[in-house]
C-alpha cells in the first residue's frame, strides 16, 4: 500500500504473511506467517551452495519492492506497491513504465492488463492488446494466458494535487481526507 499524509510525507510499503491467512495458525489472535516457503529447500545445486538456502539467521529472498519515483530534487511524483510473490517486481515495473510513457491517471495505471516474464514463458493477462501479443510471438515468446491478481496501490502527483487508485483485481480502495 501507499500513503501520503497531510504534511506531505509519503509511505510505500508491502507487508506479507505469505499465503492467504499465512500458515493458517493463530496465536493470541495473530495469524502466523509461512514465509519459510520463500526459501529454497535444496541447499546445494551442482555442488555449490544455493543462495536462498535455509540457514540460521537468514531471511528469504523477496520480490517486495514498494517504490517511489522522485524529481531530481527528491520530491515524490509517484509511489507504487503490490502484493503478488515473484510477480511483484513485474507489477510495479509495469506501472512505472506506463507512467514514464505518459499515462498519469492512477486508475488506468493499476488496471491495465499485465505482461510478465519470470525467466521462462511470458504470462499475458486477459485484455492484453492483440497487436502487442503478436509482436511478442514474432520475437519467439512462449505465451501463456493467466489470471493475475496484483493488488497494486498507487498515488500520483498531478497538476491538480494527488490521485490514488487501488487495483480492481483485488479488495482495496483509494481514500483521501
Predicted features and spans:
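Proteins synthesized as precursors that undergo proteolytic processing into mature forms
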Residues: 1-146
Amino acid at each position: 500500500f501507499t500513503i501520503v499524509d497531510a504534511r506531505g510525507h509519503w509511505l510505500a510499503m508491502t507487508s506479507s504473511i505469505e499465503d492467504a491467512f499465512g500458515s493458517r495458525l493463530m496465536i493470541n489472535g495473530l495469524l502466523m506467517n509461512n514465509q519459510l516457503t520463500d526459501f529454497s529447500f535444496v541447499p546445494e545445486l551442482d555442488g555449490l551452495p544455493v543462495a536462498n538456502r535455509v540457514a540460521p539467521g537468514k531471511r528469504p529472498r523477496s520480490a517486495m519492492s514498494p517504490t517511489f519515483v522522485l524529481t531530481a530534487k527528491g520530491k515524490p511524483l509517484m509511489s507504487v506497491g503490490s502484493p503478488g510473490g515473484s510477480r511483484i517486481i513485474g507489477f510495479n515495473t509495469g506501472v512505472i513504465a506506463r507512467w514514464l510513457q505518459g499515462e498519469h491517471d492512477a486508475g488506468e495505471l493499476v488496471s491495465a492488463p499485465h505482461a510478465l516474464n519470470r525467466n521462462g514463458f511470458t504470462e499475458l493477462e486477459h485484455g492484453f492488446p492483440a497487436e502487442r501479443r503478436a509482436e511478442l510471438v514474432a520475437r519467439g515468446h512462449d505465451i501463456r494466458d493467466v489470471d493475475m491478481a496484483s493488488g497494486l496501490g498507487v498515488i500520483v502527483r498531478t497538476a491538480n494535487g494527488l490521485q490514488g487508485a487501488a487495483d480492481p483485481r483485488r479488495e482495496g480502495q483509494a481514500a483521501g481526507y
